[in-house]
Amino acid sequence: EDDADLPKRGVDNFGFIFKEVDGEFELQKVVICEVKASESKKNPPEVVYETRDSLYKSLLELSKGSDRLMKALVKSFDRFDVNKFAALIAELAVDIEKNDALQDTKKKMMIVPFLLRTATTYSDDDFGVFYTDPSEFSGATINYYIMVVDVALSDFADDLYSSVRGES
């Protein structure tokens, strides 16, 4: 969802995993996902670590309690039953605001880099720094997904958007 103050800079996918225990809900994970696509022949492609808005840099910023994360949290209030979940999300927002290190909060974070690659450009090395040195995310869970397609990414995107719009 785009951020009105920063067009094209909202969190790509954002959500929560709750668990019900004895009729009460507990916040298990805050899921923070960024999505990139690349047909670069470089492994990993630049969008993993090198570009200004790379998966790594974007997700690291979010995991440190950036304004983008806080805005995503605030927007989430509209989507939940106030009696069940709002207090949990509010507690999380307060924890982020008052805690520079975020060590306890990071334990509840699931960081999800999602990379779209073509069959001709994909390599196991595409996991890059998320695999070789994820230490800056210490405490957080990292679930890295790479989706490989057999067509050009532009064709895949055209087909995807047509499908979403109900054109195919």
Residue spans for each PLM region:
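C-terminal structured domain segments
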Residues: 106-145
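Acidic, metal/cofactor-coordinating or nucleic-acid-engaging core segments within structured domains
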Residues: 41-112
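Conserved nucleotide-binding/hydrolysis micro-motifs of P-loop NTPases
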Residues: 20, 37-40
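Generalized protein targeting/export and membrane-interface segments
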Residues: 28, 34, 41-43
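Charge-rich, low-complexity intrinsically disordered segments
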Residues: 129-168
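Short, solvent-exposed loop/turn segments that connect beta-strands within catalytic domains
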Residues: 20-28
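Short N-terminal edge-element motif at the start of the domain
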Residues: 1-8
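Conserved catalytic cores of phosphodiester-cleaving nucleases, focusing on short active-site segments
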Residues: 13-15, 31-37
